[in-house]
Amino acid sequence: MNSTEVIILAGSLILISLIAYYSIKMIVDKNRHKAIMEVFNETLPQVVLEKSNERFYEYQFLNADKLYLIKVLPFDIHHELIITNKYYWCMNADLKGWKRSTVPDLFPGVKEFVDLIPATTLKVVKIALIMPDCHNIIRYLNESDVAKVLPSDLVYGVYFVKSVDLRSFFPKTE
């Protein structure tokens, strides 16, 4: 093989890899959207869940004179969410071996979501929706103490709710 053939082969492999990656990402996103719509249709059939045009949250809806903003956090059931401070939410895949010195797997757009003040007179409720579920949601209270976060806990202006807890969450916020 000469250098031209190698370049064409490498370019083809890169192109095929990119197409495969974006195809899989599109399928996963479509399935997640479908699952979210099903959860909300079962929980709140009267609301119209709209996809957001914003980059840092995915959905919004109006219910009982409140505007709900939803940031979706895709999770594995065996991982946990650790809220280290207002702007750093990280996924922990190693439940027993995690330390504060562990390199975090941070969620993007958290600062923008937490600091967002929409131009509305309605009360705004921000929800971080964990899809489909996670092992634990914990937050650091200080350097050494942590607390388990419940769906009813307002943490830095955001409710952290697992999709399996969504049905029990809404009666508590009305």
What spans do the regions from the language model cover?
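Surface-exposed interaction regions that form or flank ligand-binding interfaces
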Residues: 1-56, 61-69, 73, 77-83, ...
